[in-house]
């Protein structure tokens, strides 16, 4: 089983959260209010106050906790219904140390992208034991990539390639956004943290409990990320890693969707490295230096790389194999970026003018890029946004008189 990632490094809390200050996406600097109806479990009603800033009226909003949908060392996630609107939401309830800011909350407030889970608002609650909990109210997405893959595996089927392309493309798009705009490294990319809407097939990256803004030269903990998806530099104990650890994890997810099972199913940290070496071969001294300079004198058994085309079944498209090989490189700097992955020929089918879901419905939005393209070359942008989409955008621009 995957090992749980440790609690992220704390952030100092500037002050205790006052009871009457609202916390929604428009109030970036506000603290969260407190809620009535504590110890929330299934069937309980939680009421809190939102608004009250920038001329907005305060209003009470109540949630009925319906069922627990996730548990972990962090706390619980439960599905809830807003009694005022009938909207279904997900509420992540985490124990809050009063001395520190919650990093997940700070990061989620800064993010806004179609392929990243969105924060609606948040509030604090307390228990009879005077424990303080932070409740993050998020949009509800019913499925995870893990459960979707399990559905196919249980039926002894492989996931259809069109869905592999659709889900992975959107995952890379979400990663491209968090890596470039807020500059965040997720640090726990895995199928369980990729949400899927079964009707629209829109994908959203979730669970930013391990995420962090990486600062060059500033050390980070290496014991991060669930084991099967852990980049080799983390296994080597590197502390000055980059967002390329997410790219490795995404490569592992791609391989898992193609194979129907994890590519590197290590039973321990050391065994994880053995599983990687069995496929990629023994890393060279230069590759080891790129991962962690302290290990260059360490002697590894010499094992030849297993050819990628033999890792996957014979009918696997060469574009899929090529993309996996570009993601799963020992040297972090040699892994392609998330945007480069989006532009890879493996995803060309998604860019065809008449491409649709197998049921005939349109794809979810795939080309509504945000600020992540700001520093991209014109050549990359032209590969990312197909001509028919650019033509339509130009047509709409002139027709609206903008």
From Swiss-Prot:
> Catalytic residues per the record?
188
Q: EC number(s) of the enzyme? A: 2.7.11.1
Q: In which tissues is it expressed?
A: Expressed in lamina joints, vascular tissue and nodes.
GO CC annotations, alphabetized:
cytoplasm; nucleus
Q: Which GO terms describe its biological process?
A: brassinosteroid mediated signaling pathway; cell differentiation; negative regulation of brassinosteroid mediated signaling pathway
Q: Which domain of life is it from?
A: Eukaryota
State the protein's purpose: Serine-threonine kinase that acts as a negative regulator of brassinosteroid (BR) signaling. Phosphorylates DLT and BZR1, two positive regulators that mediates several BR responses. Phosphorylation of DLT and BZR1 inhibits their activities in BR signaling. Phosphorylates OFP8, a positive regulator of BR responses. Phosphorylated OFP8 shuttles from the nucleus to the cytoplasm where it is degraded by the proteasome. Phosphorylates the E3 ubiquitin-protein ligase PUB24, a negative regulator of BR signaling, which targets BZR1 and promotes its degradation via the 26S proteasome.
Name of the protein in its database record: Shaggy-related protein kinase GSK2
Q: Which organism is it from?
A: Oryza sativa subsp. japonica (Rice)
What is the gene called? GSK2
